[in-house]
A protein has these predicted regions:
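FAD-site-proximal beta/loop scaffold in flavoenzymes
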Residues: 135-159, 228-235, 239-322, 414, ...
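Rhodanese-like catalytic fold shared by cysteine-dependent sulfurtransferases
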Residues: 426-479, 487-520, 524-562
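A Rossmann-like FAD-binding core segment of flavoenzymes
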Residues: 29-33, 85-106, 113, 180-276, ...
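Rossmann-like dinucleotide-binding cores of NAD(P)H-dependent redox enzymes
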Residues: 162-163, 170-228, 307-313, 329-356, ...
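Glycine-rich dinucleotide-binding loop and its adjacent helix/turn
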Residues: 120-182, 217, 276-278, 499-509
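Hydrophobic/small residue at the entry helix of a nucleotide-binding pocket
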Residues: 14-15, 171, 528
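Beta1-alpha1 glycine-rich phosphate/pyrophosphate-binding loop at the start
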Residues: 2-85, 127, 177-199, 337, ...
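Mid-to-C-terminal Rossmann-like scaffold of FAD/NAD(P)H-dependent oxidoreductases
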Residues: 2-6, 12, 293-406, 437-441, ...
Length: 562
């Protein structure tokens, strides 16, 4: 009788436990050991902001099964038949002898673990910038359970009134909401021109405006130069201003933990993460890697990319496990599909942004399509703004972004599947999606957005981005900015430089418009703007464009006459 396969897994948070569980399901007699440097196992790191806010009441909920059983070493031993060595650090891989040298964090006792197959799930660590006095008390990163406990302890003292978030990415945005809910005054500082660099500028700007409406101060193009304080942080000094701070959260992203692999001579990819093939094998065929320590492949460009997400880590852990057990499963790559809760808004994206698509060499067409997320006459209807990016030549969908209180995740999931399948806008526009008034408009938002892009490609509509219109206004270009909304809407909010002719009166007032000038039409969402452009073209006007997305997608200052 052959000896059980020995599998050592380094890392016990996401990809590691997933791999261990799948290996035991496929090969019940396998000898599986998880080595985890920290105390806690298999916890939901993405849930930490909600633990800080109090939405998640107890720490154990983050590491429990759906029926409330905590996934601790006893659980893994009794339920999974997996041996766990937590609070134990993997020090060195001896590839020739196929063993891992480990040391207990408390007590420093060392031992050696032999393996037939090794899985590296070493994760990532928060990036801590080399800023003067970054080691002051009350300066935190948010990566693990202990970080969250430290933040909660400061909040419990009731003295963290002013909090500065350094970094405007996903972690920064999510923890900002948690801190506002705890009564803090929050300032977000982002070095780049926009927060949420995974979005196009105009979508990120709408997120910024929405956060500011909830009392958050957002400073972009602002670099932190130092921290001030005697023992505890008291201020954050930027190149523009000094900000009072009782607490600071560093949310500048993570870096893959690759030192163990690198010292062992495993290949590191161009992103700085461990290079793996589609089977999650490293450059050593006996060693697999998965999760935040590895790089992936962008499904659209084919280039290596680093997109650390818990969802990806679990999928990769499963693929690695199947192949450890002799299977032939592949992980094809990622689209960077992401969703984020920002107060009452859903912000989501997948695939390439317009900027990334152009940088990748695509000639693109875009669609901005705001609309209610369900039938407009239903009382539960909420606004949702969609942006689609497609390739002009092939008409294939390349990317999608969503923002608003409506169900954006649903539409972005559809977009992710459409991109993965290589669907064109024409195929997406005729997709047989579910419809009932409480759940969707008759023409779903993503179908409408696809049709907007198709209208552009087919010559029925010429669009112009709000950013370009803003530049034209600033440069005092000679054009007519035609608002075709109702007088009541115009009195409620208007855009600078606009002229009002309601759509219902346009046919009778064509003589008021100069045929020699360009006319850019718009309304609340530019559906009426599109109708107006068709009326103008039919009347012989040659220079007519529609502002994409209308007032709803205008990311600049608006006028409120009332």
């Amino acid at each position: 009788m052959s000896e059980p396969m020995k599998v050592v897994i380094v890392g016990g948070v996401a990809a590691g436990p997933k791999a261990a569980s799948k290996i035991i399901r496929l090969m019940p007699d396998a000898d599986v050991t998880i080595v985890e440097k920290g105390r806690f196992l298999s916890y939901a790191g993405c849930g930490l902001p909600y633990y800080i806010s109090g939405v998640v009441k107890e720490q154990k909920e983050l590491m429990a099964t759906p029926v409330g059983v905590v996934r601790d070493p006893v659980f893994f031993q009794n339920v999974k038949n997996v041996h766990v060595m937590n609070e134990t650090e993997a020090l060195e891989i001896d590839r020739a002898s196929k063993c891992v040298r480990v040391r207990e964090v408390v007590g420093s006792k060392e031992s050696r673990l032999d393996y037939d197959k090794l899985v590296l799930a070493t994760g990532a660590s928060p990036f801590v910038p080399p800023i003067p006095k970054v080691d002051l008390n009350n300066i935190f990163s948010l990566h693990g359970v202990q970080d969250a406990e430290g933040i909660k302890a400061v909040l419990a003292e009731g003295k963290a009134q002013d909090v500065v978030i350094v970094g405007g990415g996903l972690i920064g945005v999510e923890v900002t909401e948690a801190l506002v809910q705890r009564g803090c005054r929050v300032t977000m500082v982002e070095m780049l021109p926009q927060m949420l660099g995974i979005l196009d500028w105009e979508i990120a700007k709408l997120v910024e405006q929405y956060m500011e409406s909830h009392g958050v101060k957002v400073l972009t193009n602002t670099k932190v130069e130092s921290f001030e304080g005697d023992g505890k942080v008291k201020a954050v000094v930027t190149g523009k201003v000094s900000l009072p701070a009782d607490m600071v959260i560093l949310a500048i992203g993570v870096r893959p933990n690759v030192q163990l692999a690198q010292v062992a001579g495993l290949e590191i990819g161009p992103t700085g993460a461990i290079k793996v093939d589609e089977h999650m094998r490293t450059s050593d065929p006996e060693i697999y890697a998965a999760g935040d320590c590895v790089e992936s492949v962008d499904l659209l460009t084919g280039h290596p990319c680093y997109v650390p997400l818990g969802s990806t880590a679990n999928k990769q852990g499963r693929v690695a496990a199947v192949n450890v057990c002799g299977g032939n499963e592949c992980f094809p790559g990622v689209l960077g599909s992401t969703v984020c809760k920002v107060f009452d808004y859903c912000v989501a994206r997948t695939g390439l942004t317009e900027t990334a698509a152009r940088e990748a060499g695509y000639e693109v067409v875009t669609a901005l399509a705001p609309a209610p997320d369900i039938a407009h006459y239903m009382p539960e209807a909420k606004p949702l703004l969609l942006k689609l990016v497609a390739d002009k030549a092939s008409r294939r969908l390349l990317g999608a972004q969503a923002i608003g209180p409506g169900s954006g995740d649903k539409r972005i999931d559809v977009a992710a599947m459409a991109i993965t399948a290589g669907l064109t806008l024409d195929q997406l526009a005729n997709a047989d999606l579910c419809y009932a008034p409480p759940y969707s408009p008759a023409m779903d938002n993503i179908i409408t957005a696809a049709n907007v892009a198709r209208n552009k490609l087919d010559g029925h509509m010429v669009g112009v981005a709000p950013m370009e219109v803003c530049r034209m206004l600033e440069e005092k270009r000679n054009f007519v900015f035609l608002d075709v909304r109702s007088p009541a809407e115009y009195e409620e909010v208007r855009l600078p430089g606009s002229t009002l002719i309601p759509l219902g009166t346009l046919r009778g007032r064509l003589g008021e418009l100069p045929s020699s000038k360009e006319i850019i039409t718009f309304c609340k969402i530019s559906l009426r703007g599109y109708e107006a452009s068709l009326i103008l073209k039919a009347a012989g006007f040659k220079k007519v464009r529609v502002m994409d997305g209308g007032v709803a997608m205008w990311p600049y200052e608006k006028l409120f006459p009332s």
